[in-house]
């Protein structure tokens, strides 16, 4: 019985310290909305085993406020059509919030098939690795689930996840 009391007391102390130390200027920002944007492509030099993609999305209907995601990524043909949870591309993403602060992420994407209209279905998991301004030290993750018309470069879909902003 003493062990249970000791473990309970240690757990209570740990949780109190953890909650108090992160409460100042800390918070969780939920991301849940729609995205729309476009991409452009450039083939790899010989041998052409893939292509580079550059693009951007905009969104205005999340708790984060209006933002734009800018990205560049190499895409290897060997990964196209891979099953879910297999890396298709990785990239560094900068999301500019309304006041100009940014969030940096690392992305892993895959192409689990086609959308109902025949466009490419792309699912990307973004891990937040930091940021600037009020997002310095931010952590969290979000998922982009989108359809891409490869002929026009137009893309649209949804974004969902959380950003954990640490107190200073």
What is each stretch, according to the model?
Residues 2-11:
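Bacterial N-terminal signal peptides that target proteins for export
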Residues 25-168:
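Beta-strand-enriched cores of mature, soluble protein domains
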